Amino acid sequence: MSETVPAASASAGVAAMEKLPTKKRGRKPAGLISASRKVPNLSVSKLITEALSVSQERVGMSLVALKKALAAAGYDVEKNNSRIKLSLKSLVNKGILVQTRGTGASGSFKLSKKVIPKSTRSKAKKSVSAKTKKLVLSRDSKSPKTAKTNKRAKKPRATTPKTVRSGRKAKGAKGKQQQKSPVKARASKSKLTQHHEVNVRKATSKK
């Protein structure tokens, strides 16, 4: 009897272990893992491109200046130093960034002309166009004064020919009157001579 009891207890223990539910370790899908790994890299690249688009340095921003800009944006630069360097290298290889100085992750970087956002280009164009408009307006504001003075100077010239023409008309009228008056005088003289001759003839006939 002593030998059968332990065997029964052992079989009962094995059956109980089989009945217990086995916990399976859940595995995350591959897509979630890759996404979680890529998110910090994407955020770093976005922050770098934004910092370079805002900067007005023609030569480009150095690595130290980029780190300062990222720290000001709230990014932990000390913990993610290696990620910053890797993202810089990948952006240079993709052609998004241009390395103006240095080699590798050290040196100065700036955005390539193809990747400059349209907003910055439009702002630059607007500023240039606004400056040109101001210059044109200032020139135009000066030019009307000269135009007014020229108009004032031209007005007497327009009035003078009228006076000259009126004077010419008056002279022409006087000349015509003078030309007409000698004819009248001649006609009156001829009439007087005719009357005188008639009177003389009458006197001679009476004699």
Curated annotation (Swiss-Prot):
Modification after translation (UniProt): Phosphorylated in early spermatids. Citrullination at Arg-58 (H1R54ci) by PADI4 takes place within the DNA-binding site of H1 and results in its displacement from chromatin and global chromatin decondensation, thereby promoting pluripotency and stem cell maintenance.
Any one biological process term the GO annotation gives: chromosome condensation
Residues of the site described as Important for nucleosome binding properties: Q56
Comp. bias (Low complexity): 7-16
Name under which the protein is recorded: Histone H1t
Phosphoserine modification, residue list: S9, S143, S166, S181, S190
Subcellular location: Nucleus; Chromosome
Superkingdom of origin organism: Eukaryota
MF terms in GO: double-stranded DNA binding; nucleosomal DNA binding; structural constituent of chromatin
Tissue: Testis-specific.
UniProt signal peptide: none
Organism (species): Homo sapiens (Human)
Modified-residue entries (Phosphothreonine), positions: T159
CDD domains per the UniProt record, alphabetical: H15 (cd00073)
Protein family membership: Belongs to the histone H1/H5 family.
Keyword annotations of the record: Chromosome, Citrullination, Developmental protein, Differentiation, DNA-binding, Nucleus, Phosphoprotein, Spermatogenesis
